[in-house]
Swiss-Prot record:
Designated name of the protein: Large ribosomal subunit protein uL2
UniProt feature, compositional bias: Basic residues: 257-274
Pfam family, one: Ribosomal_L2
Ranges where the record places region Disordered: 224-274
SMART domains the UniProt entry points to: Ribosomal_L2 (SM01383), Ribosomal_L2_C (SM01382)
Biological role: One of the primary rRNA binding proteins. Required for association of the 30S and 50S subunits to form the 70S ribosome, for tRNA binding and peptide bond formation. It has been suggested to have peptidyltransferase activity; this is somewhat controversial. Makes several contacts with the 16S rRNA in the 70S ribosome.
Assembly notes: Part of the 50S ribosomal subunit. Forms a bridge to the 30S subunit in the 70S ribosome.
GO terms of molecular function: rRNA binding; structural constituent of ribosome; transferase activity
HAMAP family per record: Ribosomal_uL2_B
Keywords, sorted A to Z: Ribonucleoprotein, Ribosomal protein, RNA-binding, rRNA-binding
Assigned protein family: Belongs to the universal ribosomal protein uL2 family.
């Protein structure tokens, strides 16, 4: 059961808090055999330089090893529990296969404890089941889509997202993404039936800066508040507008300027996003 709670304004930090509580989530620790130590990088690369700004601190986290390949075919898996995962917006499900192996999978919406899932070439079109795109009926809502066969899911993994299978053409399937983009994917690539869980994720409001810090996100300082050595908008006597069109700290135009590099997979885009 999903509960959306708005906090009472007992303090400035509580006034704007909106929390989403799922009473069906497991409240204990994660399964020990599928957890790894996650070292905090604080946005630094191997030379110690900051390559991603505004990262550092936050609560210590463990990485949950999630199965994105779903390559254990024709063996039924029973859902033991649905869990929170601090590393992604979606919830995850701990499943127990008939041969005794346990794995974490991204939980689709509607998947509950004691339900069963299965992956394979020809399995039922039911929520949580994984199969090649060639065996999925047109119009089906899908997620966790592979871009290359057997590489593992790379698209549609965030909370509440989904794509729709709209066509099949020779060796390719055509899928419509949430952005409106139409993309071709090989029919041998796998996908999971359904919508990704935790679709209420966007309704959350953290309410205060400290809640961001708990998540390892540091403050974002405006360029006009910096010195000229730190940003192209920096400096000036008194408050200024920056004196030029908005740019990044490295002088590249921002606010609508397209910076996406051409990729080899661009040729698979049938219709660009809106």
């Amino acid at each position: 059961m999903i509960e959306i709670k708005k906090a009472k304004p007992t303090s400035p930090g509580r006034r704007h808090v909106v929390s989403v509580k799922n009473t069906e989530l497991h409240t204990g620790k994660p399964f020990k055999g599928l957890v790894e130590v996650k070292k905090s990088k604080a946005g630094r690369n191997n030379t110690g330089r900051i390559t991603v700004r505004h990262q550092g601190g936050g609560h210590k986290q463990h990485y949950r090893i999630v199965d994105f390949k779903r390559n254990k075919d024709d063996i039924t898996a029973k859902v033991e529990r649905i869990e929170y995962d601090p590393n992604r917006s979606a919830n995850i499900a701990l499943v127990l296969y008939a041969d005794g192996e346990r794995r974490y999978i991204v939980a689709p919406k509607g998947l509950k404890k004691d339900m069963s899932v299965i992956s394979g070439e020809k399995v039922d079109v039911a929520v949580g089941n994984c199969m090649p795109l060639r065996n999925i009926p047109l119009g089906t809502v899908i997620h966790n889509i592979e871009m290359k066969p057997k590489k593992g899911a790379q698209m549609i993994r965030s909370a509440g997202t989904f794509a729709q299978l709209v066509g099949k053409d020779n060796a390719y399937a055509i899928i419509r993404l949430r952005s409106g983009e139409m993309r071709r994917v090989l029919l041998d690539c796998r996908a999971v039936i359904g919508v990704v869980s935790n679709s209420e994720h966007n309704l959350k409001s953290l309410g205060k800066a400290g809640a961001k810090r708990w998540r390892g996100i540091r403050p974002t300082v405006r360029g006009v508040a910096m010195n000229p050595v730190d940003h192209p908008h920096g400096g000036g006597e008194g408050r200024t507008s920056g004196g030029r069109h908005p740019v990044t700290p490295w002088g590249i135009p921002t606010k609508g300027y397209k910076t996406r590099r051409n990729k080899r997979s661009n040729k698979l885009i049938v219709q660009k996003r809106k």
